[in-house]
From Swiss-Prot:
Protein name: Elongation factor Tu
Biological source species: Sulfurovum sp. (strain NBC37-1)
Lineage: Bacteria, Pseudomonadati, Campylobacterota, Epsilonproteobacteria, Campylobacterales
Binding-site residues for GTP, renumbered to this chain: 19-26, 81-85, 136-139
Originating gene: tuf
Region: G3, residue numbers: 81-84
Region (G4): 136-139
Amino acid sequence: MAKEKFERTKPHINIGTIGHVDHGKTTLTAAITAVLAVAGDTELMDYDAIDNAPEERERGITIATSHVEYETATRHYAHVDCPGHADYVKNMITGAAQMDGAILVIAATDGPMAQTREHILLSKQVGVPYIVVFLNKEDQLDDEDKEEMLELVEMEVRELLSEYDFPGDDTPIVAGSAFQALEEAKTGTLGEWSAKIMELMDAVDEYIPEPKRETDKDFLMAIEDIFTIQGRGTVVTGKVDRGQVCVGDEVEIVGLKDTQKTTVTGVEMFRKEMDCGIAGDNCGVLIRGIDKEAVQRGMVLCKPGSITPHTQFEAEVYVLTKEEGGRHTPFFDNYRPQFYVRTTDVTGSVKLQEGTEMVMPGDNVKINVELIAPIALDEGTRFAIREGGRTVGAGVVSKIIA
């Protein structure tokens, strides 16, 4: 566990990069940390450290969700670099769920692509409240029609955002080149391309408000990963959804199996020890007397009695169209997809409500769901509906039945 204390001096915001594969999300993440490091606000992370899951570099696509931290003059950011490839939408869902806002990266050379649309939709469904746009690869546009191209892409992006109920007309859009900015920062001086990155971060500072932290609500953290620390016990990691967790607190582990009670013996963030983790923090929580095998991804850590496991609920869902990457055909009563809740997939069967014969791609309907395993649920819990690894719908729990 960590030894250094984490100091809270600036407001803390969770942010991330989203967008189509190879439009430059990871390069931008590296450029932001590099430029801010030269500006004196941040320690440097190199590109490979961000693109750090072993399977990534063979295929040149980012698979795992990487976390980096950086600071602007006014804020501390935890930044997730979200996977861009459609195969990895599952990670996109866990990653995007950790954002107070997102930077949508679009190559000015291509304009919005299939996954640009998919990520905007997913951002809407998983509750990413604000998007700032970076038009990347400006250096690759021809000088004579550069202005025109940028204007065209900008118009297209604003329309696309509005289509998914984001305020397209008011969204900040900054053009630049992440690659050129990164090259500049490597020399230790900031030039015109770095200035674009600073402009982007100013837009992020101003446009993405400090989230209303849900610190006063009952503690809940979705468990993403589980480790054993020799001689100390079991550590569970995840993002604190709401409330706070402090050393000495009694907590429950809810979902999938019988509810277990335990006590928190340590909390850490970015390898630094803390007394408490609060809503919005990505942290590790050390729990007493619980075997690693007794905990799995998809369970939640929570204040005792605050949330209970359920298998049956009513939900409001949106079914993706074929164009959005969804089903090509309708589904009927007793349809059995996977329901992706917080950090895990659980199979469930769908009961259509009276008067509904079938559900077409593009429909927005109320359905009843029965899961094969209990999950910690309450009204307002969001989920994705998936089939064979691809997202075919999204929904929110409107009523608990059992």
